[in-house]
From Swiss-Prot:
Pfam families: GTP_EFTU, GTP_EFTU_D2, GTP_EFTU_D3. Its EC number is 3.6.5.3. Monomer. The lineage of its organism: Bacteria, Pseudomonadati, Bdellovibrionota, Bdellovibrionia, Bdellovibrionales. One of its GO terms (molecular function) is GTPase activity. It catalyses: GTP + H2O = GDP + phosphate + H(+). The keyword Phosphoprotein does not apply. This is Elongation factor Tu. It is found in: Cytoplasm. Signal peptide: none annotated.
Amino acid sequence: MSKEKFTRNKPHVNIGTIGHVDHGKTTLTAAITTTLAASGKAQAMAYDQIDKSPEEKARGITISTTHVEYETDNRHYAHVDCPGHADYVKNMITGAAQMDGAILVVSSADGPMPQTREHILLARQVGVPALVVFMNKVDMVDDKELLELVELEVRELLSKYEFPGDDIPVVKGSALKALEGDTSEIGRPAIMKLMEACDTYIPAPVRAVDKTFLMPVEDVFSISGRGTVVTGRVERGIVKVGDEIEIVGIRPTQKTTVTGIEMFRKLLDEGQAGDNCGVLLRGTKKEDVERGQVLVKPGTVKPHKKFKAEAYILTKEEGGRHTPFFNGYRPQFYFRTTDVTGVCTLKAGTEMVMPGDKIEVSVELIAPIAMEKELRFAIREGGRTVGAGVVTEILE
C-alpha cells in the first residue's frame, strides 16, 4: 500500500496534554481523536493505544511519548501525550516535542495538584507560548459552586506563573463521557469547544524559516583559491549570497560576508531553515572558525558565559551517574555542536543533587557560547550524557 501524501493545506501546530497524574490527560487525548474522527478529521485512538507509549531518545535521554494527529476546520495538530510524570519533565526540558501550546488538564474533583503546578512552571520556564484549560470529570462534582472555585484556583495558579490567568479559556467537560459518545454538553460538545479554544487562543507558530538566520558550525574546510567553507544545518531563517553575517561564540565575534552557498555540490542563491549546506566566507581563514560557533544575522545573538537553567539529571538506570553531585560540580555542557566545561552553582538550600532529580542551577562556562533563553543543552561527563537542560535566564 502506498503511503498517503501529507497535504499541507492548513497551518501546522504542535500541541500536548499536561497536568497531574490521573486527571485524565490520556483519556482526553483519546476523546479528542474519537470525537474528531466522527467528522473524518482524525483516526480514533483507544485509551490503551495511547497509553503504551513507544520510547524515543532525545539528547541521549530515553522518553516515552505518544504522538497522535488530528485536524480541525482551521488547523492540523500534532499532539503529544506522555504516560509518566518523569516523561513530561524530560520531554519539556529536552524539547523532544516542541510545543506551540498545551492543554492543561485538571480534575474538577481534585482541583490543582502538585504536578499541575510543576507542569505550569515548566511550561513557563521552557517557553510554551499559550495554555488552554480543560476541567475534566465535571460529572463527578454535583456542586456548581465547587466547580467555580476550582476554576478560580486554576486561574490564580496560572497568573502566579505569569500566564494570563484571567484570559485563558477554561472548558468544562468529561473526557470519559465524550469517549463513550455522550452528546450532552459535557461530552462531545465540550471536546469541540476545547478544539475551538485551541484554534483561536493558541497563536500560529512562527515558522523557523521566518525567524532570524542562525546556523551552528559543524565543520570547517579551506578550498584553495576560494576560501573557507563552513558546513552545518541551518537552524532558522534564510542566508543569501552577499549577506553580512557574524561568527559568534568561543572567541571574539567576527563579521564577514557570505560569498557562496552550496548544497549537494550545487551552488545556491540561498540556504534556508532545515538545509544542510556549505557557506563560503570572504576573507576568513580556516583557523578563525571552529565547531561550536554559530553563523548569525549581525546583532541578533550574543555570546554568554553565565546562565540559569532548569535541568533533569539522569538516573543510574538511564545510563546516568551512580552518585550524587554537589555545589561546584564541573561537567561539560553540550550546546548545539560542542562541549564546553562549566561550573554549577546549586540553588540556596540545595545541598546535593541525586540522579533522577529535576533542578534549578546557575552555570558559568569557561568559554562564551552563542546563547538565548530556551536554548537546550546536554550535560555530559567524558562524552556520556548525564543530564539535559534548558536555559531559563541569561546572567551575563
